[in-house]
């Protein structure tokens, strides 16, 4: 399955969940596209709830179905911790996500483009693979020629706070994944247990 590249607000309205994290997509029209007036989603079956939760998580991080399911399988091979928690941590360790968490991009999609176009370095070496798994302590930065990109400047100006498991040096324009996140520090509106149930059904 290919990656969705259309308007994220449409997906947000369909899922009843803000992919941007701002809630703006749902503030004016809190119902699915094609519906008018009140939300007519109705009650979902157990499978429907599991599927919706899986789609919420997959679309939040911008992965294809294959990437998502492969990462889920990897999480299942980690011996310590819960499957769902480990899955969330692996999603957070993706390079495109860390770039987003550092504030170098306004959205994960924008962060993925920065990585794809060769603007990002890890420990001083250019890395253009969005799925690259970042280790705690690795230094994430912009290439020298990329530090004046307007989209980066705008993203940094819009930052109002960062998650506690990353650190960013505004002067050096570089940051690190300080440690692996705790589940409590990630989106509370995602129920990863339903995602585990979906794949284990």
Curated annotation (Swiss-Prot):
Residues 20-46 are annotated as: Disordered. InterPro entries: Ribosomal_uS4, Ribosomal_uS4_bac-type, Ribosomal_uS4_CS, Ribosomal_uS4_N, S4_RNA-bd, S4_RNA-bd_sf. GO terms for molecular function: rRNA binding; structural constituent of ribosome. One of the primary rRNA binding proteins, it binds directly to 16S rRNA where it nucleates assembly of the body of the 30S subunit. Residues 93-156 form the S4 RNA-binding domain. Belongs to the universal ribosomal protein uS4 family. Pfam families: Ribosomal_S4, S4. It comes from the Bacteria. Keywords: Ribonucleoprotein, Ribosomal protein, RNA-binding, rRNA-binding. Disulfide bonds: none annotated. The keyword Ribonucleoprotein applies. This is Small ribosomal subunit protein uS4. GO terms for cellular component: small ribosomal subunit. Part of the 30S ribosomal subunit. Contacts protein S5. The interaction surface between S4 and S5 is involved in control of translational fidelity. It comes from Ligilactobacillus salivarius (strain UCC118) (Lactobacillus salivarius). GO terms for biological process: ribosomal small subunit biogenesis; translation. The keyword NAD does not apply.
């Amino acid at each position: 399955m290919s990656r969705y590249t259309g308007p994220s607000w449409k997906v947000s309205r369909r899922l009843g969940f803000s992919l941007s994290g701002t809630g703006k997509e749902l503030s004016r029209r809190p119902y699915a596209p094609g519906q008018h007036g009140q939300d007519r989603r109705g009650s979902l079956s157990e499978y429907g709830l599991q599927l919706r939760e899986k789609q919420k998580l997959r679309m939040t991080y911008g992965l294809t179905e294959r990437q998502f399911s492969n990462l889920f399988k990897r999480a299942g091979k980690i011996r310590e911790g819960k499957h769902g928690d480990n899955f969330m941590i692996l999603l957070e360790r993706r390079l495109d996500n860390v770039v987003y968490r550092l504030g170098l991009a306004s959205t994960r999609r924008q962060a993925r483009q920065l990585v794809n176009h060769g603007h990002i370095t890890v420990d001083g070496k250019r890395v253009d693979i969005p799925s690259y798994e970042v280790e705690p302590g690795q230094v994430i930065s912009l290439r020298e020629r990329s530090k004046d990109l307007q989209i980066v400047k705008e993203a940094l100006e819009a930052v109002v706070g960062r998650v506690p498991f990353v650190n960013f040096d505004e002067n050096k324009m570089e940051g690190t994944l300080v440690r692996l996140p705790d589940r409590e520090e990630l989106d509370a509106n995602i129920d990863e247990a339903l995602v585990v149930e979906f794949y284990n059904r």
